[in-house]
């Protein structure tokens, strides 16, 4: 009778230890999932704000370039990717790339169109874009750091057992490079 009680207590103790262990690792996963979701929302908001700023820049550039017919002919090409986005749905990383190309295009236009770099509205918008770029860079670094830890938890024992029970999947870095596949074409610059 006494040995039966000891066995029952041992089983209860093992179950309790396992439950505490499971809850601890589960909560660790949840912590990183929440961090990742929050920073994704921050990146999304900043990308949308940057996109809106580029939509404000387009009419300003067109307005400051009215007299120049040579540049006027190029206007349909100015920020054409930004204009096309109005009718498309894309992911954050693709938007990030398009907006990065728009940054380069804005610098190029400032060099090509005389007086554009002196326009106060353009200066203000450029400052806001630079501020947003810093926020996005910091957020993507934080995102990738958390993804690294999350993916490490998925791979290491014993947290990989909890991940398998909860059906957690590996997440990609912000640049969408999948380090675990054989596809080398996803390493775009």
For the regions a language model picked out, list residue spans one by one.
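A helix-centric hydrophobic-segment signal that preferentially recognizes long
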Residues: 2-189
């Amino acid at each position: 009778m006494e040995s039966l009680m000891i066995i029952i207590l041992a089983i209860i103790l093992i179950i309790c230890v396992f439950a505490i262990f499971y809850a601890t690792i589960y909560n660790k996963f949840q912590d990183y999932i929440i961090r990742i979701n929050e920073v994704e929302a921050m990146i999304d908001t900043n990308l949308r704000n940057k996109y809106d700023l580029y939509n404000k820049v387009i009419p300003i550039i067109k307005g400051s370039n009215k007299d120049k017919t040579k540049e006027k002919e190029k206007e349909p090409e100015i920020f054409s990717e930004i204009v096309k986005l109005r009718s498309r749905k894309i992911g954050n990383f693709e938007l990030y790339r398009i907006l990065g190309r728009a940054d380069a295009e804005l610098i190029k236009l400032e060099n090509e169109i005389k007086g554009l770099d002196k326009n106060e509205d353009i200066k203000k918008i450029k400052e806001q874009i630079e501020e947003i770029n810093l926020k996005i860079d910091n957020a993507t670094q934080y995102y990738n750091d958390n993804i690294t830890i999350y993916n490490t938890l998925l791979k290491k024992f014993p947290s990989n057992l909890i991940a398998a029970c909860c059906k957690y999947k590996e997440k990609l870095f912000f640049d969408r490079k999948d380090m675990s596949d054989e596809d080398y074409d996803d390493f775009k610059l």
